[in-house]
């Protein structure tokens, strides 16, 4: 069984928001997952959809996997990881000379596909 990965590093969305969508597609076939994400209203669904398409493209590239091209119907999402990335820290001035910290969070999205034969 072959493993194909795709990454989106430093995605400008918090990991918590993407994990909600990632839990929906974990364990699905790649074509079903893309159909599911197409109708999700969350912004994280668009980002995850692009990463899955990239992983499918890696699986269909014959140069990367010794001359074989895998069909999208035979690919299963076995690994979806959404980890926290670096934070941009900003200062927001408040009353009486105080300042509040604003944390603009980012995330690293990783998708792993596995080829299943005879589906």
Curated annotation (Swiss-Prot):
Alphabetical list of CDD domains matching this protein: Ribosomal_L22 (cd00336)
InterPro entries recorded: Ribosomal_uL22, Ribosomal_uL22_bac/chlpt-type, Ribosomal_uL22_bac/org-type, Ribosomal_uL22_sf
Pfam families associated with the record: Ribosomal_L22 (PF00237)
GO CC entries: cytosolic large ribosomal subunit
Keyword RNA-binding: yes
Record keyword Membrane present: no
Keywords: Ribonucleoprotein, Ribosomal protein, RNA-binding, rRNA-binding
Disulfide bonding pattern of the chain: none
Molecular-function GO terms, alphabetical: rRNA binding; structural constituent of ribosome
One BP annotation, GO: translation
Role this protein plays: This protein binds specifically to 23S rRNA; its binding is stimulated by other ribosomal proteins, e.g. L4, L17, and L20. It is important during the early stages of 50S assembly. It makes multiple contacts with different domains of the 23S rRNA in the assembled 50S subunit and ribosome. The globular domain of the protein is located near the polypeptide exit tunnel on the outside of the subunit, while an extended beta-hairpin is found that lines the wall of the exit tunnel in the center of the 70S ribosome.
Family statement drawn from the similarity comment of this UniProt entry: Belongs to the universal ribosomal protein uL22 family.
SUBUNIT field: Part of the 50S ribosomal subunit.
Protein's name according to its UniProt entry: Large ribosomal subunit protein uL22
